[in-house]
Amino acid sequence: MRGHLFLNQNEYLTVEEFHLIRNMDLPQDFLDFLEIGFRTGLRAVDILNLKKENINLKKERIIGNAQKTNLSMDVALDKISLDILKRRLKNAEVNNLFVDKFGNIYKPGYFGKYYEEAHRNIYPDFLLHKDITSIRRGNRDFLYMHDVSIAEIEYRQCFRSAYDDDLYVEDQSNSLYVINKFLK
């Protein structure tokens, strides 16, 4: 296992925090968002804009294009993420999977307030601000510490430079192994 290189713990969601938050009494939509975000490393905006056609159940992948970069998304799903998305597909009354009771796509700030509430519960004696982008950074750091290649991590997160925009990582088994082993 590699050591911690990139960020200090105030900048990313740790595995310990992830486990604490996922067991809190918070809205299910937020908990689903948290699970998918930490497991896939996708940007919040990409998760919030997931549509039915972005879920390939046969290949067990999220597909489409990233909102920010327009890069191709082809993210292999672990069992828990797949189960969450299957449930959301089954219950979806509109094309988008993360919508409020009126059918409107959630805004990042809606989930941000629950994320901040969770951190206040974890650290009641500290003023600590972690925004929801720390979920994505936590995924990156978590996978990196468990020896998943940078290429695989960046491909899963749709984070590629102009020099490697044709990068394609079909086999994401290292990520799935680490996710399934440590994020039960």
Please give the residue ranges for each predicted region.
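Conserved tyrosine-mediated DNA breakage-rejoining catalytic core shared by Y-recombinases
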Residues: 40, 49-86
